[in-house]
C-alpha cells in the first residue's frame, strides 16, 4: 500500500464534507457580497479592477462549464487572472456550473439576463468592519487546499 492510497482512504469522507462546506460558504458569500454591492462580474471588468485596485479584492471565483473548457481565449484569461491573484494573495476557486452561479447572483442592473459570469471578484466594501464568516471559511479552505498543492481548488455549489 502506498502513501497516496493510505491518505486517499482516510480523506475521502472528510474531503467530501470539506467540499460541501466550501460550496455552502461560497453560496452564502456570493449572496452577502451581492447584497452589499461588492461583486464585480466579467473577465474584462475583473481584470480592470485587479489592475487598478488589487488590495481591495478579497476573493475570486472563476467559472466555466464543460463547453467553455475548449475556449482558448477564456483559458488564457483564467491563467492570467490566476497568476495575478496568486501574486497579490487573493484566494481563488473554480466553479464548474455557470448557470447555478447565475441563479445565485441573479440578473444584471437592467433586469435582464446575467452577463459574463466567468470571473467574479468580491471586494471589500467601504466599511472596515465587514467580516463575513463565509469568507473566513473559504479563506481557510483555500489555505488548506494550497497545503495539498491545489492552488485553485474546484468547488461544487449546493443545489
Curated annotation (Swiss-Prot):
In the record, biological process GO terms are: apoptotic process; positive regulation of cold-induced thermogenesis; positive regulation of MAPK cascade; regulation of cell cycle; T-helper 1 cell differentiation
Pfam families under this entry? Ribosomal_L7Ae
Q: Which SUPFAM superfamilies match?
A: L30e-like
Question: Mind listing the UniProt keywords for this protein, alphabetically?
Answer: Apoptosis, Developmental protein, Differentiation
Which GO CC annotations does the UniProt entry carry? nucleus
What does the entry's domain section say?
Two central helices mediate homodimerization through parallel packing.
UniProt name for this protein: Growth arrest and DNA damage-inducible protein GADD45 gamma
Organism of origin: Mus musculus
The gene name reads Gadd45g
Amino acid at each position: 500500500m502506498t502513501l497516496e492510497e493510505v491518505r486517499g482512504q482516510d480523506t475521502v469522507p472528510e474531503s467530501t464534507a470539506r467540499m460541501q462546506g466550501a460550496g455552502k460558504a461560497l453560496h452564502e458569500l456570493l449572496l452577502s457580497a451581492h447584497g452589499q454591492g461588492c461583486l464585480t462580474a466579467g473577465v474584462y471588468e475583473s481584470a480592470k479592477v485587479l489592475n487598478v485596485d488589487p488590495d481591495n479584492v478579497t476573493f475570486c471565483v472563476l467559472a466555466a462549464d464543460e463547453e467553455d473548457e475548449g475556449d482558448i481565449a477564456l483559458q488564457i484569461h483564467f491563467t492570467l487572472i490566476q497568476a495575478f491573484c496568486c501574486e497579490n494573495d487573493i484566494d481563488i476557486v473554480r466553479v464548474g456550473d455557470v448557470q447555478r452561479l447565475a441563479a445565485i447572483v441573479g440578473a444584471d442592473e437592467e433586469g435582464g439576463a446575467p452577463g459574463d459570469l466567468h470571473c467574479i471578484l468580491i471586494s471589500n466594501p467601504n466599511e472596515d468592519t465587514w467580516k463575513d464568516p463565509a469568507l473566513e471559511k473559504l479563506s481557510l479552505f483555500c489555505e488548506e487546499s494550497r497545503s495539498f498543492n491545489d492552488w485553485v481548488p474546484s468547488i461544487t455549489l449546493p443545489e
